[in-house]
Each structure stands twice: as structure tokens, then as C-alpha cells.
Amino acid sequence: MPKLIDHDRRREEIAEATWRVIHAEGISGVSIRTVAAEAGISTGSIRHVFPSKTELLVHATELVGQRAWVRIQRHLAEPEPRALVLSVVEELLPLDAERRLEMEVTVALIAEAPGNARVREVLDESYEVVREVCRRLVTRLRRAGLTAPGVDVESATTVLHGLVDGLAIHLLINPDPDFRRQALRMIEASIDGLRS
């Protein structure tokens, strides 16, 4: 009897192998061959799922967003708005090995994007999703009375989004636990600053 393959799981395993190759060798090390070797499967098996390197990179990019969304959803039932905002923002920062790897992959793919329109398209979509998450967080704070009455939601969204993106890069460069604590305090100060 032929072996049944869970195609969604196989796609995820291949994307994870792509992440590991990017982590070890950078984006230039990614090929159907290197990813197949990392995943422990044949190049034919990879080509069956991802006919090109671009499709492989696109799925690797999409998986980063999917994983972040799953983590974010765990916090959406948090009744206290400030705690909700802080917990969601933390999910967007490279504060552990899993999120650090995802951020390394994202940065590598950002560098690849100017020469790859399809990767650029997926990254643009991811950018808009994160911006919308930030907008909803600011709106939630405003509705809960945790911002000044006249706060400009769009401006506050831009500030929060920029702070998250900037701190993500800084945390990637400097994973020191003291800096992690400082970064989280900066997020808290920014959120609390919306009250004035």
C-alpha cells in the first residue's frame, strides 16, 4: 500500500528546512538541492511541491507570518487592553530562539526582495498585516480610555509599528537579556505615553 503523505505538513517541513539553510548559509545558500539535503528528502520531492526557488522562498516567508498569527491569537482573549497590547507586541519581537530564527529569515528575505517581485509582494502583505495589528492595538487602547482623547490613531499606529520593527532589528543584533528587558520597557513607555 502506498505511503500517505500529509502535503501541508510536508510543505511546512520544507519551509522549516529553508529557514535552517538561511540561518546557516544566508539566502545565497538556498537552492532546491541544499533544502532537500537539509530536509532529508529528494530534490524531486521538493520540486513536486515547490517547482522553483522563488516558490520555496515565498512559502518560507508565508510560514513566518502564519506562525506569528497563531501565537498572536493565543492572546486575543486577554480582557485587559494594556496586557493584550503588550503580549501581542512581544509575539512580534525575537525574544526566543523560534522568533529569532523567524526574524533572521525575514531580514534575509527583505534583502532578497529587490530582485524577486514575488517575495517582495509577500513581504508587502506581511508589512500591511503587522501595521493593521498595530492599528487595532492602538484602537483597542483608545476605546478602553487608555489614550488621550484626541490621540491620532494613524500617527500612533505608525509610531508603534516603527518601534516594533526597529526593536526587532536591535534585538536580532543584540540579544542580551538586559537589552530585552530594556526593549520591553520602551514598548511599555510608548503605550503609556499615548495617555498624554
What are these regions (language model features)?
Residues 7-18, 35, 60-64, 68, ...:
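Generic hydrophobic, amphipathic alpha-helix propensity
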Residues 13, 17-59:
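Helix-turn-helix
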Residues 26, 112-117:
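Short loop-to-helix capping motifs
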Residues 74, 98-107, 117-143, 155, ...:
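Amphipathic alpha-helical packing segments from all-alpha helical-bundle domains
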Residues 59-62, 70-103, 153-160:
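Hydrophobic alpha-helical connector segments
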Residues 21-24, 38, 49, 67, ...:
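Residue cluster at the C-terminal edge of the helix-turn-helix DNA-binding motif
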Residues 55-56, 88-95, 121-128:
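A ubiquitous short alpha-helical element
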Residues 83, 118-124, 142-194:
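Hydrophobic/aromatic-rich alpha-helical bundle segments in the mid-to-C-terminal region
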